[in-house]
A protein has these predicted regions:
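Short S/T/G/P-rich N-terminal loop/turn motif that feeds into the first structured element of a domain
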Residues: 1-94, 100-116, 131-186
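Conserved His + Asp/Glu catalytic blocks
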Residues: 117-131
Length: 186
């Protein structure tokens, strides 16, 4: 049943590999992963260069500060969420990157490279084994690394499916405006 606001939760079981082999749509750098109830996204698991674990925590603080100083610093990426984890497997540390966003995979990764190249910043990915050293000028190599380390999900769920981050922000602004209007009427 449709709830208030016109949304209905949705789940999508994903085929092994992340997309239907009979419905492959090619992007600039390979198959386009489908939009799901959780929008677009990807998960990367890659081994970090030994001894670099502190760099990841410092980098997280840098992202926190950058967003606090300039809230729209990552806006071009159309992100909903990012989640980063470090974990050990047989004594080696791995990095897991999980991102949910509103653009397709190719656009997201191209935009990410452009943000870093324009700002002069480095990416925490430079601390991953096998990450291309020329990534700032070689978007295809960056994207190949991401695709090679992507671990497709096999289930995605959305409480408010297929809704963009911009739509959510607009709905929250509208709610605040209505609340303010009702307060003014009292």
């Amino acid at each position: 049943t449709t709830r208030q606001g016109g949304t209905k939760p949705a789940a999508m079981a994903m085929p092994k590999g992340g997309f239907s082999k009979d419905k492959i749509e090619q992007g600039r750098y390979g198959p386009i992963f489908p939009k799901t109830p959780a929008c677009y996204g990807f998960s990367i698991i890659a081994k970090i260069i030994p001894g670099r674990e502190p760099v990841f925590y410092e980098y997280a603080k840098n992202i926190e500060k950058a967003v606090a100083d300039q809230p729209d610093v990552l806006a071009v990426l159309k992100l909903h969420y990012l989640r980063w984890n470090l974990f050990d497997i047989k004594g080696e540390t791995y990095f897991q990157y999980m991102g949910i966003f509103d653009t397709d995979f190719d656009k997201y990764t191209e935009d990410a490279v452009a943000i870093f190249a324009a700002s002069g910043l480095n990416t925490v990915f430079e601390n991953l084994e096998g990450f291309p050293k020329d990534w700032k000028t070689n978007a295809p190599a960056f994207i190949k690394f991401v695709r090679d380390h992507h671990r497709p999900s096999f289930l995605e769920y959305g409480e408010y499916p297929f809704v963009s981050a911009d739509e959510i922000k607009k709905a929250l602004q509208l709610k605040a405006a209505f609340s303010n209007m009702l307060d003014q009427m009292q």
